């Protein structure tokens, strides 16, 4: 289920974000940023997420990519260091020129990179539940907020 959701999200993200922002002379690839900790305390949780996104990218590319363009993953390691998420997010958007970012496993990592996304008009797919009461046009919150979880409990 998680893999299928990631696959659908990647495809939607490329269609929405990447193609309209690409320069006319762009290569036949769309760069996808992966912002998950591969070292430090959060690596045990986030390495699996990185692997899931890479697997989804491989599946999309095997089917011809997105609108004929292959997806090119750009993986960075913020090393479970919350301020480093902002720095690595900036690197992905400005130096690596990714069209979209998948990443962050904690609210503090998301909140660290959020000002960078807002400043540079980047797009983040955030893969986990969050506390709610935060809205950004630069973040797809794919996890449930508390009010959504409460509705399920009440209807059960």
Regions found by a protein language model. Give the residues of each.
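Sec/Tat signal peptide C-region and signal peptidase I cleavage site
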Residues: 22-26
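Bacterial N-terminal signal peptides
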Residues: 11-21
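Extracytoplasmic "Venus flytrap"
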Residues: 33-52, 76-83, 105-108
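Signal peptide-proximal N-terminal region
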Residues: 27, 51-73
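Extracytoplasmic ligand/sensor domains, especially the bilobed periplasmic-binding protein
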Residues: 97-156
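Short beta-strand elements in bilobed, periplasmic/extracellular small-molecule ligand-binding domains
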Residues: 66-79, 135-139
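N-terminal export leaders
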Residues: 3-11
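Short, well-structured alpha-helical segments in soluble
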Residues: 74, 79-99, 155-156
């Amino acid at each position: 289920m998680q893999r299928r959701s990631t696959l659908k999200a990647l495809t939607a993200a490329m269609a929405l974000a990447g193609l309209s922002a690409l320069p006319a002379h762009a290569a036949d690839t769309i760069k996808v940023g992966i912002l998950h900790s591969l070292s430090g305390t959060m690596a045990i949780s986030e390495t699996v997420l990185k692997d899931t996104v890479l697997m989804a990218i491989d599946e999309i590319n095997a089917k011809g990519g997105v609108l004929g363009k292959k997806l090119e993953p750009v993986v960075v390691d913020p090393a479970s260091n919350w301020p480093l998420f902002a720095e690595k997010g900036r690197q992905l958007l400005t130096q690596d020129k990714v069209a979209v970012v998948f990443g962050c496993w904690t609210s503090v990592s998301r909140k660290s990179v959020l000002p960078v996304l807002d400043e540079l008009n980047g797009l983040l797919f955030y893969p986990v539940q969050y506390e709610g009461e935060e809205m950004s046009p630069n973040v797809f919150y794919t996890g449930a907020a508390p009010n959504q979880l409460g509705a399920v409990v009440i209807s059960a």
